[in-house]
Amino acid sequence: MDNQSSYDSMMGFMAREETRTRTVTSPRTGTPEGRTLTGPATRAWTMRLLVLGIVLTALNLRPAITSLGALLEEVRDGLGMSGSVAGLLTSVPPLCFAVFGVTAPRLARRFGPGTVVCAGMAAITAGLLIRPYTGSTAGFLAASALALMGIAVSNVLMPVIVKRWFPDRVGSMTGLYSMALALGTASAAAVTVPMTEVLGGSWQTGLAVWAGLAAAAVLPWIPFVRDRGAAPADSGQEQHARVDAPPLRITRSRTSWALAVYFGLQATGAYITMGWMAQIFRDAGVHAGTAGLLLAVTMVMGVPLAFVIPRLAGRLPHQGPIVLALGACGLAGYAGLYLAPAAGSWAWAVLLGVSNCSFPLALTMVGMRARTSAGVAQLSGFAQSTGYLLSIPGPLLVGVLYQHSGGWGLPIALMAGLMIPQMAVGVLAGRDRTVEDEAAR
């Protein structure tokens, strides 16, 4: 299913719901957790705008990273970076996601999720526009951190928004969001190099142009900015956007820890892939444009699969079999990169693309492992922040191993080795239970 048909299908669902009035009741408190939606025209407009905001937000959550991966060699030469510093650069995304992502639930309680996501999109716009023209490695890192801060809070709040606005369509909406995220990731990887050549060959221009897409994503969230997390019960527009944290000790839950480690290991593999895979192919003799296209193939595999996997996962009581299947594809892809990186490059790109769909699976499990949207907010913040913190050393270590070994054998062996514990904790995270029950015990 392509992106347009998926969007049309979701719009059809919204249209069928226009004449209904629904209140979502919290199992924890017994009180309405969502808003009672009245006024078919207002509801239809709000829901369509929200879906547009979710899709545009998802499109902007990876181009800041994959566009840099496609031009990493040019950026290194232009700023005089060593291999170790470049490895540090590829570790900045998970570091920012860990540091800033943990603040997202608190910010959402105070200002409302819509306000925070709108500010996040503005931060991405500013960071992408500034970073190519700072003229130094330190400035480049600082501007990248600004953009990644916006990505971090939006990463955490997307499952919360899906759970609150679409509690009976978590799998479908997560699939739509994940599919748009994969599309943005793949597009940046595929078109950054040729677009840079068309625009005159300057890597600065090739990176800065992605600020335009981020600016477009600010607009749908502006109507949701007026909520400050304290709307009266009859306000109708944003009552349910407030995220009240439950009295839940999330660290008592084994599932929350398993999900956090799974999130961290899949993020490690994903950011190593986005930051280094194009360089692996280039070092194997593949042309720079083709290497970027191969990275795009890896990313674009997530477009259809990111829609299918969450829906399939939502229908299964245990997501372990999906975890194992994705892990097996990753192991096969790494083996191919090690043995014949250039000869079978397209096959390895496809296999690693399938394996990278662990990300939408992890997001789906976040939505399924908690009963309430407040629980999802806390679980999402914990799993993503802890997971991204765990993923920080991976890309940096790959850069160090590459520089000191003079080849890709050791880095690829590291990537393959990390896939084994990822599969193990993924099976644990996929068990049919909730963090509320585990924390209570």
Features from the language model and the residues they span:
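Juxtamembrane intracellular "pre-TM" segments in multi-pass secondary transporters
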Residues: 34-43, 226-259
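Extracytoplasmic gate region of multi-pass secondary transporters
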Residues: 68-69, 254-297, 303-304
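Helix-breaking motifs and short loop linkers at transmembrane-helix boundaries and internal kinks
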Residues: 80, 112, 133-138, 167, ...
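Conserved MFS/SLC helix-loop-helix module at the cytosolic interface between two early adjacent transmembrane helices
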Residues: 99-138
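Helix-loop-helix hairpin linking two adjacent transmembrane segments in secondary transporters
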Residues: 168-169, 176-229
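C-terminal transmembrane helical hairpin of 12-TM major facilitator-type secondary transporters
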Residues: 319-362
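A late C-terminal transmembrane helix in Major Facilitator Superfamily
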Residues: 370-408, 415
